[in-house]
Amino acid sequence: MVHVAWLGKKSPFCGNVSYGNSTTKELKDRGHKVSFIHFDNPSNSNAKNPLFLANDPEVSLPYLIKSQVYTIPSPRAEKELKISLERLKPDIVHASLTLSPLDFRLPELCNQINLPLVGTFHPAFDIKNRNLTANTQQLTYQLYAPSLGKFNRIIVFSETQKKILAKLGVNKEKQIVIPNGVDENIWEPLIEKNKKHDAVRKKLGDGRIFLYMGRIANEKNIEPLLRSWRKTKTYNCKLVIVGDGPMKPTLENSFSNLSEDKLIWWGAEMDLETRVAIMQIAEVFFLPSLVEGLSLSLLEAMATGTACVATDTGADGEVLDNGAGIVISTDNVSTQLKTIIPILIEHPAFTKALGEKARDRVIERYTLKKNIDAIEKVYIELKNSFKN
């Protein structure tokens, strides 16, 4: 068994939080020891030592500012991280990037205490750099590449992402392609109605449900979806927006003329069972992002048998290729959706067939078991090589 010190996020909720929670839970279920290190105790606390107990699997580091995207650590965070790692004595340090400017110090810090360092590199990308958001994300890759080259292994989600990092100088031999995975036994089509399902359905009301679930940020490109929905005749159909983020107040204000029988702003949803129930009830899931990595929300929707429409950015187009969903370009999203949405509304049998193909694709390629099998292999190889 392997003892992993996991550097990740617990809050605010985002894809990185989902990735860390699902991966570490599965590792623990397989008998591995996981110590979760994250930014949690505010820097203005009076604590002089890391929030660490000998029998506590979690370590909290101080921060100045924390958001869905990035955290600014307290000046003493690096010292506290080093002290924690020296006490924990893990076999592996695994960082779920990006977290904070402390990311760039990890290779040197782990080298000082002779610990192998693995990173999962989440930032979204678009190989074609078709917009300003994609160009901004490319800068993130350029900024991180020199540091990533000093990690012992870097986990990426697709061959395309691997090529981008290789062009920036990150050794291909250090990069391991391990796509995201979801638990198909949790994210599954509704088999039998339950209290959670009934409660969610009551809140949503009658009608067919079309869904976006994720961060409400500029790069998620939700506005074209809302514009298209507003201009489409959607009798007995509702668009539900689940999530939170910096663009939410602006978009809510811009589309305040849409009544609740056409558009529902659900807000952030932390409860797993509720998120599963929403996905199960939804007929179609939209992901109109300008840039992506490999969206966990997309995989979760596919696993529940929900028909999916996503842009061809990051690895999402690859996930839905050959009929597992509808792939659109990041160019003129609104125009494409104005054509697609009426078809999906008028042909429920088509959405049902798409949903079935989507779940088949997840079972074939993107289960959590396959993901953890591959991560375990990386851990064991590194642990053995450091022993020798």
Predicted regions and their residues:
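Conserved donor-binding/catalytic core segment of Leloir-type glycosyltransferases
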Residues: 5, 204-229
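Carbohydrate-associated surface elements
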Residues: 40, 160, 181
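Short alpha-helical donor nucleotide-sugar binding micro-motif in glycosyltransferases
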Residues: 268, 277-282
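Aromatic "clamp/platform" in nucleotide-sugar-dependent glycosyltransferases that forms part
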Residues: 290
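Conserved acidic donor-binding segment of nucleotide-sugar-dependent glycosyltransferases
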Residues: 322, 326-334, 343-348
